[in-house]
Amino acid sequence: MGDNRELAAKVEEVLKGGDFGGMAQLARDYSTDDFVEEWPQSGERLTKAATMRMAESYPQMSGTTPKFTYKRMLGGGDVFVVEGTIDYGDGVPVSYVGIGEIRDGKVAKMTEYFANPFEAPAWRADFVERMEPARV
């Protein structure tokens, strides 16, 4: 990720820890004042303040304590991509992809996608090689 190594290391450290509470501190320390987090699938956008409040209160408000399992982070220049899975307490490994945009050494925007596992349709069997689905 170019000269953003310190930022990349901190993001990776927090994500590997899997603690959503740590994400509030990460947003506080390593995001721009005008940071936004967008979830295109549900049509939601959060400001920096809302991201921190939600991360801090997630277990109380949602009734679950999600666990993030880090897979990898790739990037270069001012863009990075994070891949992992999230277990919201029901054992379902929700696939996660986050695209981060960096400005002045801090995260300015995160666009995040969440996908539940699904069975592959039978008609694709002749075209694909089977692999293990994501696990938490």
Regions found by a protein language model. Give the residues of each.
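Short acidic-aromatic low-complexity motifs
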Residues: 1-34
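A beta-strand edge to alpha-helix "cap/lid" segment located at domain peripheries
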Residues: 3, 53-136
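Hydrophobic alpha-helical core bundles mediating ligand binding, dimerization, or RNAP-core interactions
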Residues: 8-15, 31, 51, 55-59, ...
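A solvent-exposed, acidic/Ser-Thr-rich amphipathic alpha-helical stretch
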Residues: 21-76
